[in-house]
Amino acid sequence: IIHNLFTPRMLPFLKKKINYDHIAWVTYTHPEIATFGVNQSQLRERKISYELFDYDFEHDDRAITSDSTYGRSKVYVGTKGKQKGKILGGTMIADAAGELIQELILAKKANLDIKHIFGKVYPYPTASRVNKYTIRPWFARKLNERTKRIFKWLY
């Protein structure tokens, strides 16, 4: 942004267009509200195919131990074409949501597939595991019924 304030007058050919799809913001209330990327209405307007993943912190182990179970995470993931499996945007309402959402912001900016977040090993219990839990249903669908029963029995 600073670049665009000074450069156009001096060197107009260096002017860069700002991509607002990568802008994030946090509202510092209690709890915090952190948002990044595109929202649901923008996705519909652009006719982008997506799936919404929603996770409530009520039963999250770290949220329970830190007495901050009031929280929710919503993440939009592309479902078709080059955006399939890519994080498109999201919102988190929680204590320290501005810090918890950083991993998702980086994944969006770097155009990482959600398997990179899901495949990451998080220390237990870590607050940022909510990012993995939010997108878990994407991968759970791919398991066959026998595997699901085994995991249900184990966990």
Identify the role of each PLM range.
Residues I1-Y20, I48-S49, K108-I114:
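Internal hydrophobic alpha-helix adjacent to the cofactor/substrate pocket in enzyme cavities
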Residues H22-A24:
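Short, glycine-/aromatic-enriched active-site segment of Class I SAM-dependent methyltransferases
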Residues Y28-N39, R44-Y155:
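Flexible, glycine-rich terminal cap/loop adjacent to redox cofactors
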